Amino acid sequence: MNALQAEIIAALKTQPTIDPAKEIRRSVDFMKAYLKKNTFLKSYVLGISGGQDSTLVGALTEKAMQEMRAETGDESYQFIAVRLPYGEQADESDAMAAIEFMAADQVKRVNIKGSVDAMVQSLAETGVTVSDFNKGNIKARVRMIAQYGIAGENSGAVLGTDHSAESITGFYTKFGDGGADLVPIFRLNKRQGKAMLAELGAPKHLYEKVPTADLEEDRPALPDELALGVTYDQIDDYLEGRQVSEEAATKIENWHKKTAHKRHLPITIYDTFWQ
């Protein structure tokens, strides 16, 4: 392990192995503790894509809210799952299967197409032609705006799905899906998230599907690994302190350097200023 690898692992808090049940408990307790300390909060809001990460955070959140209601007798504690399609989503069935699995207290659907297209048109009227890639980032940021709109009307906080395998590469939109109040699975890599979903009894197809941000229309359902040029297994091995090929290590470290500006992290399980 080189010095940079050790530094990255320490910063992202990744462990070489985990006990899935203990990490489930840890994330749930983190979310509950934040609610107990901030008694004006009554809901958590999370965008649901139908992929592994939002399915995991959603399942953990519903567990936390069920326990909060049982422990306090306050039925106003609610988990609000939000579908945020741009028009029609190709894998809508996966998103609905994820919501059914996590048994969210409330489900809202906000079609972001009108807002995104209006912004693109407004920019065009000023002479700015938005690229397909940039439009994808606008989609992510509109989704963030919608979630905060819902949270603001429901005494809520917005949850993010950032984890260490995503954070190391900066594979998220700054002030888009990177915009959140709490990130309950920060410290985990991709395979550890899979292990936690297996422990929770999630349908396999929700965490074995090919990961994709699916933001670009010119390249629909572009696999994360193709966009990054490195596999999640290689990223996970790197984060667990294992040896990876020189080519993979270079790509991972280049992504880490290039996206350093994105890692001004929201509140994690390791922050103590709010306690």
Swiss-Prot record:
* Molecular-function GO term, any one: metal ion binding
A UniProt-annotated Pfam family = NAD_synthase
Q: Where does ATP bind?
A: G47, I48, S49, G50, G51, Q52, D53, S54, T161, K190, T212
Q: Which controlled-vocabulary keywords does the entry list? A: ATP-binding, Ligase, Magnesium, Metal-binding, NAD, Nucleotide-binding
Q: Which pathway is recorded for this entry?
A: Cofactor biosynthesis; NAD(+) biosynthesis; NAD(+) from deamido-NAD(+) (ammonia route): step 1/1
Q: Does the keyword Metal-binding apply?
A: yes
Q: List the disulfide bonds.
A: none
Which residues make up the binding site for Mg(2+)? D53, E166
CDD domains attached here? NAD_synthase (cd00553)
* E.C. numbers: 6.3.1.5
Q: Which Gene3D superfamilies match?
A: HUPs
Q: Which reaction does it catalyse?
A: deamido-NAD(+) + NH4(+) + ATP = AMP + diphosphate + NAD(+) + H(+)
What the entry lists under InterPro entries is as follows:
NAD/GMP_synthase (IPR022310), NAD_synthase (IPR003694), NH(3)-dep_NAD(+)_synth (IPR022926), Rossmann-like_a/b/a_fold (IPR014729)
Query: Which top-rank group of organisms is this from?
Result: Bacteria
* BP terms from Gene Ontology: NAD biosynthetic process
Q: Which PANTHER family match?
A: NH 3 /GLUTAMINE-DEPENDENT NAD + SYNTHETASE (PTHR23090), NH(3)-DEPENDENT NAD(+) SYNTHETASE (PTHR23090:SF7)
Tell me the subunit arrangement: Homodimer.
What name has this protein been given in UniProt? NH(3)-dependent NAD(+) synthetase
Name the source organism: Latilactobacillus sakei subsp. sakei (strain 23K) (Lactobacillus sakei subsp. sakei)
Q: What is the lineage of its organism?
A: Bacteria, Bacillati, Bacillota, Bacilli, Lactobacillales
